[in-house]
């Protein structure tokens, strides 16, 4: 358990893929049974998802979200002290997405940039890291981006995973503040069952 004070979430912007995939239409086109598709749709609660157009990456989606966030907040990119990029679908192995976004946005050369390779828990881990940078690392503003294009990794014939994953990017602004209301974190992991998901 940890609590971090003097930090606030100052803004959030999201950018989704521009195309819409329909779970039922995709499943019927692959020859799946309509009754089974209806049952699956009822279970997962989704019938549509947003996916990125060909050539659009997680970096592109997060850049769009970050630009809109900075514009809405009236902030110059040079006021950002660090960028954290959470993704499991980076554009390249090197350089990392955070460094590429740093360059695209024109952040100051003194601004830190690093990726976190995490899935569902990634934004929360990124938020903790951003809050720590603001509270104890000398940063006044941190840009936390989380984005993936997981639709490109799933098998369209797999009804258990394909309908769950779309493509999106988000940008969250975390700022140092005099406010004492703490952010509370309880982080943990259990890697003992990793082979069960393979």
Q: Language-model features: where?
A:
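Flexible, glycine-rich active-site loops centered on histidine and acidic residues
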Residues: 135-168
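Condensing-enzyme catalytic core mediating Claisen C-C bond formation in acyl metabolism
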Residues: 1-55, 158-198
């Amino acid at each position: 358990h940890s609590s971090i004070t003097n930090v606030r979430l100052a803004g959030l912007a999201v950018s989704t893929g521009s195309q819409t995939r329909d779970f039922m239409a995709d499943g019927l086109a692959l020859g799946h049974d309509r009754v089974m598709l209806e049952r699956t749709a009822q279970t997962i609660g989704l019938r549509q998802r947003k996916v990125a157009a060909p050539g659009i990456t997680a970096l592109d989606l997060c850049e769009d979200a970050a630009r809109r966030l900075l514009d809405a907040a009236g902030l110059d990119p040079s006021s950002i002290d660090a960028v954290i990029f959470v993704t499991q679908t980076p554009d390249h192995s090197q350089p990392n997405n955070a460094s590429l976004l740093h360059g695209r946005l024109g952040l100051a050369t003194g601004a830190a940039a690093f990726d976190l390779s995490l899935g569902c828990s990634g934004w929360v881990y990124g938020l903790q890291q951003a809050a720590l940078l603001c509270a104890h690392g000398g940063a006044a503003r941190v840009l936390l981006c989380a984005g993936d294009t997981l639709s490109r990794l799933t098998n369209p014939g797999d009804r258990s995973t394909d309908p769950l994953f779309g493509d999106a990017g988000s940008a969250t602004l975390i700022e140092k503040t005099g406010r004492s209301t703490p952010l509370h974190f309880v982080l943990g992991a259990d890697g003992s069952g990793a082979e069960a998901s393979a």
